[in-house]
Amino acid sequence: MNREELFDVTVIGGGPAGLYSAFYSGLREMKTKIIEFQPQLGGKIHVYPEKMIWDVGGLLPVTGDKLIEQLVQQGLTFQPEVVLNTKVESIIRNKDGTFTLKANDGKEHFSKTVIVATGSGILKPQKLSIEGAERFEVSNLNYTVKSLKRFKDKTIIISGGGNSAVDWANELEPIAKKVYVTYRKEELSGHEAQVKQLLNSSAECFFHTSITKLIAGDSHEAIEYVELTNHETGEVSHLLIDEVIINHGYERDITLLENSELDVAIIDNFYIAGNANSESSVDGLYAAGDILKHEGKLHLIAGAFQDAGNAVNKAKQFIQPDASEYGMVSSHNEVFKKRNRELIKQMMK
């Protein structure tokens, strides 16, 4: 291993937690690398590019697309090395205390510390388990909502009852011709305010009910009817629809930690068990964002930023024990003086 190949911090995951980790790591003058499985940075926010995000402190409501743009710009401030289309498959602890990260392309990445910021895992939506469903994915069977305009004045059925399903139903209800929601349980499990909004809207909900069949139109290329089955009564009904949206969550990929030789404590067979300082059970390995679990964890994008800052601070002290516990705030940091002057000049034009 060449010393040039050894990074201070390697961040696995390029979503909000990973991008802020990269920014703050650069702020603390550490050589940083981001490894992301997807072909672009941004993480799960790519699933809802037109959704309005309200809960990032100091930001007015912003679309997912715009937030990604700003996060990426900030994350690349200190020019971290970015590796895309790459899956880290295992982490090994070397005799000298550094880490080797083995990727799916056969390459190895070397780092003094690691921050795992993989969120809810590699984005792989749970597909509808109906024979032949995949052929409609090119027409009107959707697992994400990338454009609200696509659904304007259409009759839509959404399968699912969690936060994503409820949020999309609320977003689409004002612009669609009709919105139906079908859920296998007796009540929706999304956030209380959003559930109340949906139940008080024109959307129609079917409980204890699932989509059991997709019926194509004369062209055989798109779904024209869905068959619904009530699991309590056995009643079968059919709905004429234009679009089907499936929100059944995402499959969790836990192979990274399963394949690693590290004794990382796990909660619920997926999450990294940590503490409020983003430390895991392995020295030098930290977690940030949705993958981290501990008592008092804040499950918001804003919480991911705090996780990231804590992880970077601990990584800095792991590498340099006499380093300060926290980085200097940006308003007084010499690193930003030149950048601030340039920004002020632009503002004065």
UniProtKB/Swiss-Prot annotation:
Cofactor(s) for this UniProt protein: FAD
Keyword set includes Membrane: no
Residues involved in FAD binding: E36, K44, Y48, V88, L123, D290, S331
Top-level lineage group: Bacteria
EC number: 1.18.1.2
Signal peptide interval: none
One GO MF term attached to the UniProt entry: flavin adenine dinucleotide binding
Reactions this protein catalyses: 2 reduced [2Fe-2S]-[ferredoxin] + NADP(+) + H(+) = 2 oxidized [2Fe-2S]-[ferredoxin] + NADPH
InterPro entries: FAD/NAD-bd_sf (IPR036188), FAD/NAD-binding_dom (IPR023753), Fd--NADP_Rdtase_type_2 (IPR022890), Ferredoxin-NADP_redctase_2 (IPR050097)
Keyword Transferase among record annotations: no
Keywords per UniProt: FAD, Flavoprotein, NADP, Oxidoreductase
Recorded family membership: Belongs to the ferredoxin--NADP reductase type 2 family.
Complex formation: Homodimer.
Protein name in the entry: Ferredoxin--NADP reductase 1
